[in-house]
Amino acid sequence: MGKKVLAIDLDPQGNLSFSLGIDDEDAYTIYDVFKGNCDISDAVQKGGICDVIASNILLSGVELELTGVGREYILREQMETIRDEYDYIILDTPPALSVLTINAYTASDELVIPMLCEILSLQGIATPPSTKRW
């Protein structure tokens, strides 16, 4: 298809990183980007299918570590520096509303929210649109 794609794993479980064969050892991850340890471009790993910014379990504590004003815009500000390098940037988020998912919402142009065809899944999906007001 010839499109340049970046996948950013925002889930502390790191399933996207694992599924794409990306190792988070000895490499910067999205946690480092949030903590200001590196620029987002330093965390990009070249993959066979697409470029990836890996996650790791440290990301699970980022909610408590990021307390400053504007914490919901960290990802958007970092992505501005690399946005023109990619045709698509896919953000894989955890399945709960948190500082990570809010960062994904503020950084995104569009949302795709996969869900089970069940009433409880449908009720849970009602939160994001009303949450996004920026």
Model-derived segments and their meaning:
Residues 1-134:
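P-loop NTP-binding core
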